[in-house]
């Protein structure tokens, strides 16, 4: 029987040595937002707790400044 092997999740920001997540980096932020506009949880993405907090803060700032939409209907 073939067993399904699940890849280990890792934090991309830790691997790349990112110090601070920038709210103006929309290409990165869009990878962590669903089509409906929700922030993807760290258990799905594998992001560490520290960077998940920075990511949420950056996404909320980008939404407030109208760089990212709150929902998909805009």
Curated annotation (Swiss-Prot):
Naming one, the record's GO cellular component terms include: cytosolic small ribosomal subunit
Q: What does this protein do?
A: Binds as a heterodimer with protein bS6 to the central domain of the 16S rRNA, where it helps stabilize the platform of the 30S subunit.
Q: Which terms under GO biological process does the entry name?
A: translation
**What gene is it encoded by?**
rpsR
List, alphabetically, the SUPFAM superfamilies matched.
Ribosomal protein S18 (SSF46911)
What family does the Swiss-Prot or TrEMBL record give for this protein?
A: Belongs to the bacterial ribosomal protein bS18 family.
Q: Is rRNA-binding tagged as a keyword?
A: yes
Q: What is the lineage of its organism?
A: Bacteria, Pseudomonadati, Pseudomonadota, Gammaproteobacteria, Chromatiales
UniProt-recorded name of the protein: Small ribosomal subunit protein bS18
Q: Which HAMAP family has this protein been placed in?
A: Ribosomal_bS18 (MF_00270)
**GO molecular function per UniProt:** small ribosomal subunit rRNA binding; structural constituent of ribosome
**Gene3D superfamilies listed in its UniProt record:** Ribosomal protein S18
Q: Which Pfam families match?
A: Ribosomal_S18 (PF01084)
- Organism this protein belongs to: Alkalilimnicola ehrlichii (strain ATCC BAA-1101 / DSM 17681 / MLHE-1)
Quaternary arrangement and interactors, per the entry? Part of the 30S ribosomal subunit. Forms a tight heterodimer with protein bS6.
Q: Which UniProt keywords apply?
A: Ribonucleoprotein, Ribosomal protein, RNA-binding, rRNA-binding
